[in-house]
Amino acid sequence: MLVAYDIALDLVRALRPVVAQLRRYSPEAADQVERAASSIVLNLAEGRRRHGRDPRRFWDMAHGSAGEIRGALDLADAWGWQVDSAQARVLLDRELALLWGLTRRSRAKDASLLASGGTARPRQLGCGPSVRGSVAAWPASCG
Protein backbone atom coordinates (compact mmCIF):
# COMPACT_ATOMS: atom_id res chain seq x y z
CA MET A 1 0.00 0.00 0.00
CA LEU A 2 1.30 3.44 -0.85
CA VAL A 3 1.70 5.83 2.07
CA ALA A 4 0.53 8.56 -0.30
CA TYR A 5 -2.81 6.75 -0.64
CA ASP A 6 -3.41 6.73 3.13
CA ILE A 7 -2.41 10.40 3.41
CA ALA A 8 -4.76 11.21 0.51
CA LEU A 9 -7.66 9.66 2.42
CA ASP A 10 -6.68 11.64 5.54
CA LEU A 11 -6.58 14.76 3.36
CA VAL A 12 -10.13 14.10 2.13
CA ARG A 13 -11.30 13.82 5.74
CA ALA A 14 -9.51 17.06 6.68
CA LEU A 15 -10.99 18.84 3.66
CA ARG A 16 -14.62 18.04 4.51
CA PRO A 17 -15.06 21.04 6.86
CA VAL A 18 -12.96 23.21 4.54
CA VAL A 19 -15.25 22.37 1.61
CA ALA A 20 -18.31 23.23 3.72
CA GLN A 21 -16.77 26.62 4.56
CA LEU A 22 -15.75 27.23 0.94
CA ARG A 23 -19.26 26.45 -0.26
CA ARG A 24 -20.59 29.55 1.54
CA TYR A 25 -18.33 31.75 -0.59
CA SER A 26 -18.04 29.81 -3.84
CA PRO A 27 -19.89 26.57 -4.58
CA GLU A 28 -17.71 26.19 -7.68
CA ALA A 29 -14.46 26.35 -5.68
CA ALA A 30 -15.87 23.85 -3.17
CA ASP A 31 -16.83 21.47 -5.98
CA GLN A 32 -13.38 21.82 -7.53
CA VAL A 33 -11.68 20.93 -4.24
CA GLU A 34 -13.96 17.89 -3.86
CA ARG A 35 -13.18 16.71 -7.40
CA ALA A 36 -9.45 17.29 -7.02
CA ALA A 37 -9.27 15.47 -3.67
CA SER A 38 -11.23 12.54 -5.10
CA SER A 39 -8.95 12.52 -8.13
CA ILE A 40 -5.86 12.15 -5.94
CA VAL A 41 -7.26 9.06 -4.23
CA LEU A 42 -8.59 7.50 -7.42
CA ASN A 43 -5.41 8.09 -9.44
CA LEU A 44 -3.26 6.62 -6.68
CA ALA A 45 -5.55 3.58 -6.50
CA GLU A 46 -5.37 3.05 -10.24
CA GLY A 47 -1.66 3.80 -10.50
CA ARG A 48 -0.69 1.22 -7.93
CA ARG A 49 -2.36 -1.45 -10.08
CA ARG A 50 -0.26 -0.55 -13.12
CA HIS A 51 3.22 -1.71 -14.07
CA GLY A 52 6.25 -0.30 -15.86
CA ARG A 53 6.10 3.40 -16.73
CA ASP A 54 2.32 3.55 -16.53
CA PRO A 55 2.01 4.29 -12.75
CA ARG A 56 3.89 7.58 -13.16
CA ARG A 57 1.15 8.91 -15.42
CA PHE A 58 -1.40 8.43 -12.61
CA TRP A 59 0.97 9.82 -9.97
CA ASP A 60 1.50 12.91 -12.16
CA MET A 61 -2.26 13.41 -12.41
CA ALA A 62 -2.61 13.01 -8.62
CA HIS A 63 0.19 15.55 -8.15
CA GLY A 64 -1.60 18.00 -10.44
CA SER A 65 -4.84 17.56 -8.49
CA ALA A 66 -3.02 18.25 -5.23
CA GLY A 67 -1.70 21.44 -6.81
CA GLU A 68 -5.28 22.43 -7.71
CA ILE A 69 -6.28 22.09 -4.06
CA ARG A 70 -3.36 24.27 -3.01
CA GLY A 71 -4.44 26.85 -5.57
CA ALA A 72 -8.03 26.82 -4.32
CA LEU A 73 -6.91 27.30 -0.70
CA ASP A 74 -4.56 30.11 -1.74
CA LEU A 75 -7.39 31.70 -3.72
CA ALA A 76 -9.67 31.57 -0.67
CA ASP A 77 -6.99 33.38 1.33
CA ALA A 78 -6.51 35.95 -1.43
CA TRP A 79 -10.26 36.67 -1.51
CA GLY A 80 -10.28 37.01 2.27
CA TRP A 81 -12.72 34.16 2.77
CA GLN A 82 -12.86 32.89 6.34
CA VAL A 83 -11.77 29.29 5.74
CA ASP A 84 -9.82 27.35 8.37
CA SER A 85 -7.56 25.17 6.26
CA ALA A 86 -4.51 24.81 8.54
CA GLN A 87 -4.88 21.06 9.19
CA ALA A 88 -5.68 20.35 5.55
CA ARG A 89 -2.65 22.37 4.41
CA VAL A 90 -0.31 20.30 6.60
CA LEU A 91 -1.63 17.08 5.05
CA LEU A 92 -1.62 18.65 1.58
CA ASP A 93 2.05 19.62 1.93
CA ARG A 94 2.89 16.06 2.97
CA GLU A 95 0.88 14.64 0.07
CA LEU A 96 2.58 16.95 -2.42
CA ALA A 97 5.99 15.88 -1.11
CA LEU A 98 5.11 12.18 -1.36
CA LEU A 99 3.74 12.58 -4.88
CA TRP A 100 6.76 14.59 -5.97
CA GLY A 101 8.95 11.79 -4.62
CA LEU A 102 6.97 9.13 -6.48
CA THR A 103 7.11 10.97 -9.79
CA ARG A 104 10.74 12.03 -9.31
CA ARG A 105 11.90 8.52 -8.39
CA SER A 106 10.13 7.12 -11.43
CA ARG A 107 11.78 9.71 -13.70
CA ALA A 108 15.21 8.98 -12.19
CA LYS A 109 14.68 5.28 -12.82
CA ASP A 110 13.88 6.00 -16.49
CA ALA A 111 16.95 8.27 -16.78
CA SER A 112 19.30 5.65 -15.33
CA LEU A 113 17.87 3.05 -17.70
CA LEU A 114 18.50 5.34 -20.66
CA ALA A 115 22.02 6.19 -19.44
CA SER A 116 22.89 2.50 -19.25
CA GLY A 117 21.96 2.03 -22.89
CA GLY A 118 18.47 0.66 -22.31
CA THR A 119 15.29 2.30 -23.44
CA ALA A 120 12.49 3.36 -21.18
CA ARG A 121 9.99 2.40 -23.87
CA PRO A 122 10.37 0.59 -27.19
CA ARG A 123 11.03 3.09 -29.98
CA GLN A 124 9.32 3.12 -33.33
CA LEU A 125 10.27 5.26 -36.30
CA GLY A 126 9.10 8.79 -35.54
CA CYS A 127 8.30 7.99 -31.93
CA GLY A 128 9.73 9.76 -28.93
CA PRO A 129 8.66 11.80 -25.98
CA SER A 130 6.98 15.11 -26.52
CA VAL A 131 6.36 17.67 -23.83
CA ARG A 132 2.79 18.61 -23.04
CA GLY A 133 2.70 21.11 -20.18
CA SER A 134 5.28 19.90 -17.68
CA VAL A 135 4.70 16.18 -18.27
CA ALA A 136 6.59 14.25 -20.92
CA ALA A 137 4.10 12.30 -23.01
CA TRP A 138 4.38 9.63 -25.68
CA PRO A 139 2.29 10.03 -28.81
CA ALA A 140 -0.69 7.66 -28.89
CA SER A 141 0.58 6.14 -32.13
CA CYS A 142 3.73 4.88 -30.39
CA GLY A 143 3.15 1.30 -29.25
Tell me what each language-model feature is.
Residues 1-143:
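Amphipathic alpha-helical assembly/interaction segments
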